[in-house]
Amino acid sequence: GSKSYWKVWWDRDVGDEKASVINVDDMNSQKTEDLDEVHIYKKIRSELGILPVRLVYSPEGMEIEKYELNTDLQKAMLLYKYKEQTVKYTMYMNNADSSFGEKETDKLTDEFLIISDNGVEIKVKEYEEKDKKVKRYEAEFEYAGAQYEIKGVVEKEEFEKILKNLYFSK
């Protein structure tokens, strides 16, 4: 994978806060010019054994930019671009170590639940980003033995629409 991309992305995402950085040495990283999400989801299923929950709805202009699979950590990360921001979708097996760099410097302004059509509880947290007057949303849920996280600066209505339209593979 391109470490320079990660360094830039990580610095931008975390700022000067101390964060535990994900080891990207053994991740297969792909730029996704000609890759479609269906192909990525199939790869996640075959290589990681995760039944991927698919993003069926995405706001206009939100496009997948890059994805990474780490078979050692049993983890997949899809990065989307949306209005000059990055939306990060991560999935990993429950037994996998989820040592994400958590930044708790933003102010938690709201927490709520969204229940998907098949009864999965999705916990959502709304943060106000320091220095920027924007809201960032983080959603977490569990399905078929895996953990899922979707994080990004997206309008609340759009974020809820993404979550309400998730497709849960059987």
What positions do the PLM features span?
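Surface-exposed amphipathic alpha-helical segments
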Residues: 144-170
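Short, solvent-exposed recognition patches
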Residues: 17-142
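Generic hydrophobic/packing signal
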Residues: 1, 122, 163-165
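Charged/polar, solvent-exposed surface patches and flexible loops
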Residues: 7, 43-46, 161-164
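Membrane-interface helical sensory segment of bacterial ECF anti-sigma factor regulators
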Residues: 1-13
